[in-house]
Design a protein with these regions (language model features):
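GST-like domain detector, emphasizing the conserved glutathione-binding G-site
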Residues: 1-114
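Acidic, glycine-rich loop-and-strand cores that form catalytic or ligand-binding grooves
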Residues: 117-118
């Protein structure tokens, strides 16, 4: 989602190709042996296979809304720090929380806990 939003905001035209993760195309694996998505393959065969890197690349090409804060690099650094915190600390904790939900408990119990976490 992050990569797609970056590409959209940067008005970059790309060809989207939906793949089945259980049946990854050989063409994709030849370009990006890591086998993860998203993958952006540039005309010069450069491969970008991290969503944040794709977003930043796209906005470096065209950033009509100044989302990279070119005149205030400290703002970009703060935003990237927040993204890193979300990816490395919050998301794993959220996954643990989601897997621990007991369907026999009332939903309000979990909503209250989530409000405390956020």
């Amino acid at each position: 989602m992050r990569a797609r939003l970056g590409l959209l905001m940067a008005q970059q035209q790309v060809m989207l190709r939906a793949i089945t993760m259980k049946n990854k195309p050989e063409e994709m694996l030849a370009k990006s042996p890591k086998g993860t998505v998203p993958v952006l393959i540039l005309p010069d065969d450069t491969v970008i296979d991290e969503s944040l890197d794709i977003m930043i690349w796209a906005l470096q090409q065209n950033d009509p809304d100044d989302l990279l804060h070119k005149d205030h690099p400290e703002d970009l650094a703060s935003a990237l720090e927040l993204i890193h915190h979300n990816d490395k600390q919050f998301k794993p904790q959220l996954e643990i929380y989601k897997k621990a939900i007991d369907p026999n408990q009332p939903q309000t119990k979990y909503k209250y806990v989530l409000l405390l976490v956020v």
